[in-house]
Amino acid sequence: MTGQHLSTDCNLVLFDLDGTLVDSAPDLAGTANDLRAAHGLPALSYDALRPMVGSGARGMVGVAFGVAPGDAGFEALRDAFLDRYAQRLLAHTRVFEAVVPLLDKLDAVGLRWGIVTNKAMRFTAPIVAGLGLAARAATVVGGDTTAKSKPHPMPLLEAARQAGVEPSHCIYVGDDLRDVQAGHAAGMSALVAAWGYLGLGEPIEAWGADAILREPNQLLHWLQLT
């Protein structure tokens, strides 16, 4: 674990979803390759697709078809991607194996936790429910729950409001630079989940996080629960 600060004043742990709590890459990568096949294109390797999972449909369509928002055909490809993804949300998506005991420990000590993701609630809600997380989470905020999404702090502030916890008593754990940016903008400690997707930008050591967690159980040490 990188980062020396230890939190003894945390009343709510907020997690990103994709790449932090759950491994959704197999279903998102599979959707991208299904759409490529529909356009007569060969499959891309899983390793080529996985880093962009955290960027959602925009990132997946971008790497699969080499297009960006504003390019001709982007919106049609994005909509087709989302339609296909909606049919396989839980085909292979699972809670990361090492995250399971982490959540169990948080529950056992009575430290509440929640989810803040840029994924739209029409996808987030069935995934969270299907994986048995909905009844356990103190709050679930999706990408369309508030007027702005991460890196804006609004979703994190809404999660804190729903849980009745001051932002300064929350921490946020995510696997993307925008997670660190959003957490700090909300007045929270921000930690990197280094087991996640991480994108293809600057190295995580340059993100300015309060700590880099190499594996989920390191969060327990950071919280002084071990």
PLM regions and their residue ranges:
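A metal-dependent, Asp-based hydrolase signature
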Residues: 53-87, 100-107
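Active-site neighborhood of HAD-like aspartate-dependent phosphohydrolases
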Residues: 2-51
